Amino acid sequence: MPAKEKYKLKIAVAMSGGVDSSVAAALLKRQGHRVVGIFLHFWHEAAPPDKGGVGGVENKCCSLKALTDARRVANKIGLPLYVLNFSKIFKKQVVADFLDEYQKGRTPNPCVRCNKLVKLGYLIKQARRLGFAYVASGHYARNIAGRLFKAKDKTKDQSYFLYTLNQAELKHLLFPLGDYTKRQVRQLAKKFKLPVAEKRDSQEICFIPEKSHNEFLRRHLKLRPGLIKTFGGKILGHHQGLPLYTIGQRKGIEIGGTGPYYAAKMNYKKNILYVVNDGNDKRLYGEKLIIKDVNWLSGAAPKLPLNCQAVIRYGHKPVKCQVVKSGGNYLVKFTELERAITPGQSVVFYQGEKVLGGGIIK
């Protein structure tokens, strides 16, 4: 943030009721800023009944408990908390796209899209309209003068999910946890006596109530059972619908006899799932890929060819690559083979700690 505006900024903090956003709000409040908590109400379906036919699984997104926790934290810190209803834009931009991508044979990352179009992008617009100078969140990343960097805690770094941001958005974004480790954040939550200090982190997609998103897909997509084959043409069994599988997947491929088997290719025209029985099979690997919908955080495309590091999915190790133009898209060539290159996932480019940009695998 600008040095001359070091104190008493008007900041809207996205508060989910979790530990990270709660500590982010507490830190800013203790620094003397005028902080207001914003709880975002996203779309969620009615909780599906459990196996006994009674009750259901509580949706992790925008649950009553999450809102209650956010209010308890706001009261403890001493700041007002408001609820903004983003359910329509969330359903249209995130949920509908998530289902459409799976139906078309791609494996999307809804968190990337949500940060750009809803949680941060849309919130910034609304917050600015309401007179806030900045929006803050509990993301683990660092924003230094409009340049995005990895967080101090590399095990929790979330810069991968933020590559779609632009300069106008970064200008109004604060990430108070960027220079803290998760352990330090937990310690601060206890020090500040926040009521969510012991609350567990959520690891799954927020708008899906179950631990596995396949049940969600089964409810919302038209799935066609089909054949599971080897590349030699041998029929091994039947799949329950291609959107339920992703490249490199092992779990959930129900084939009797020898195994294990790994999903290697989906032929949507013929509705066939091709598998291999060796996790190191060359057909699970690739040396290049093409990306679309590319965003460069600086606002301008870099000089090509670009030699940098790429992350092909969240939590994956950075690998050396070269980026060149290929028609209207970009071609990414790796120095070593990469396993399970998955259409629909994001590739994010780095130079050391700095995020350059990224795109979606075609």
Language model region names:
Residues S16, A136-R142, R147-K362:
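AMP-forming adenylation/ATP pyrophosphatase catalytic core
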